[in-house]
Amino acid sequence: MTRRALISVSDKTGIEAFARALVERGWELLSTGGTLAALRAAGIPATAVSDVTGFPEILDGRVKTLHPAIHGGILARREEGHLAQLAEHGLDLIDLVCVNLYPFRETVARGATFEEAIENIDIGGPAMIRAAAKNHAGVLVLVDPADYGLAFQDEVSQTDRRRLAAKAFRHTSDYDAAISTYLAGADEAGETLPEHLTLDLSRIAAVRYGENPHQPGAIYRLGTERGPVLDARLLSGKPMSFNNYADADAAWALAQELAAQEDQPPGTRAVCVAVKHANPCGVAVADSVQAAWEQARDADTLSVFGGVVAVSRPVDLAAAQSMRGTFLEVLIAPDVTPEAVAWFAAKKPDLRVLVADTAAHPGTLDVRPLAGGFAVQRRDTRPWDDLCPEVVTVRPPTEQEWGDLRFAWAVVKHARSNAVVLAKNGVTVGLGAGAVSRIWAAERAVQNAGERARGAVLASEAFFPFDDVVRLAAEAGVTAVLQPGGAKRDPEVIAAANELGLSMVFTGSRHFRH
């Protein structure tokens, strides 16, 4: 009996070679639309599905394969009763279904209109895939070009058939999830989140383990989103670890926020961010990558050891060589010159040197795991220009203090709460992050700064419940303070700042980070 294969694919990778090999082995091919045209153009004989169903494609191609002559041939079990019914109705078996779906994700990712997105919702394809996967004991279902070779085995094991069926159902499940997520968010104004949210995750990288050696780990992509770190190119060094991904993502996010804020016009200033355990430990803005790196390193030479560094401009040989004496895990940049890559490969072969995907932008959702669920929020992407800073003290900040306050505000946004940052001349001089009380965060930042606190500014991501931070800052030599305001004791805090001659600014915007 002649075996029949139904082929209808949007991703035509390898399809001509696959179809030709099937024909050479005596298979009869059925096909539709663009796939049929491509096969015939390549000189590969194929029968139109409409010739099998006796019914033409209708509704601009919306209905092609939804017919008993197709689904009966796919769903029939290879047993007497079903075969008799097929014979009674003049239908033939279909032994292989090779289908992948309309490119819905790609369509919406490129900014298609709602109407275009709707037209790229595949109906017949998922129906055929699900039918073949259900009847995988008798029908080979192929949704991935990497699996085409299995069709040429003398006998495909039930284990492989079951694996292919699982992949097929995962394919349609992911597809439906992408559509559901798109439709749920299509009318969202951004103020609320959908009632139902499907996370469409695909593993894209294996790592040796998670945060710790006893924890398995992997890296996943959410839907069709691209990420600057997720899709970065590794130019040199060891494979990325779980913690490397997390730290590089944190470092790059802060570097880009500061670059957008400080680098005006673009290309005139360089930002360097050093991160340890997702917290910034040294940040600087300077006229070159080398200068920015050296100032960020010197901000906390102890903590930067074993850190992850992100820079906002390409790394040249001079910048690379200036990193000679510091052990780093990862360096991520918008580009790295060939000379710098060669130097890193020779002198720092373990350092992971990444070029970020600068065209990629993170999605709007921030998803945190909970036992039994997730906490979901919009990402905190509020820019400085969205604030309405209010000077609440007698003395306003100087021009230099305003620049440093804005810089420190961006850094403290990216530190774990409770967080306090001291900065001077575009460089962090003291950071206190992850503290369980605000005064402890301030004490850590002041201790970290030492004498460098004199003439520095201080930024906090949340309000001061008491005036203790202001008094500590003044004693250390800090001259200006920025915080959201909104505490019950704001009048006491303002009075203390005035008493001590500090300038203080309220932003009205809190930036907790957990």
From Swiss-Prot:
<comment type="pathway">
    <text>Purine metabolism; IMP biosynthesis via de novo pathway; 5-formamido-1-(5-phospho-D-ribosyl)imidazole-4-carboxamide from 5-amino-1-(5-phospho-D-ribosyl)imidazole-4-carboxamide (10-formyl THF route): step 1/1.</text>
</comment>
<keyword id="KW-0511">Multifunctional enzyme</keyword>
<protein>
    <recommendedName>
        <fullName>Bifunctional purine biosynthesis protein PurH</fullName>
        <ecNumber>2.1.2.3</ecNumber>
        <ecNumber>3.5.4.10</ecNumber>
    </recommendedName>
</protein>
<dbReference type="Pfam" id="PF01808">
    <property type="entry name" value="AICARFT_IMPCHas"/>
</dbReference>
<dbReference type="GO" id="GO:0003937">
    <property type="term" value="F:IMP cyclohydrolase activity"/>
</dbReference>
<comment type="pathway">
    <text>Purine metabolism; IMP biosynthesis via de novo pathway; IMP from 5-formamido-1-(5-phospho-D-ribosyl)imidazole-4-carboxamide: step 1/1.</text>
</comment>
<dbReference type="GO" id="GO:0004643">
    <property type="term" value="F:phosphoribosylaminoimidazolecarboxamide formyltransferase activity"/>
</dbReference>
<dbReference type="InterPro" id="IPR011607">
    <property type="entry name" value="MGS-like_dom"/>
</dbReference>
<keyword id="KW-0808">Transferase</keyword>
<keyword id="KW-0378">Hydrolase</keyword>
<dbReference type="InterPro" id="IPR016193">
    <property type="entry name" value="Cytidine_deaminase-like"/>
</dbReference>
<feature type="domain" description="MGS-like">
    <location>
        <begin position="1"/>
        <end position="143"/>
    </location>
</feature>
<dbReference type="GO" id="GO:0005829">
    <property type="term" value="C:cytosol"/>
</dbReference>
<dbReference type="Pfam" id="PF02142">
    <property type="entry name" value="MGS"/>
</dbReference>
<dbReference type="GO" id="GO:0006189">
    <property type="term" value="P:'de novo' IMP biosynthetic process"/>
</dbReference>
<comment type="similarity">
    <text>Belongs to the PurH family.</text>
</comment>
<keyword id="KW-0658">Purine biosynthesis</keyword>
<dbReference type="InterPro" id="IPR024051">
    <property type="entry name" value="AICAR_Tfase_dup_dom_sf"/>
</dbReference>
<dbReference type="InterPro" id="IPR036914">
    <property type="entry name" value="MGS-like_dom_sf"/>
</dbReference>
<dbReference type="InterPro" id="IPR002695">
    <property type="entry name" value="PurH-like"/>
</dbReference>
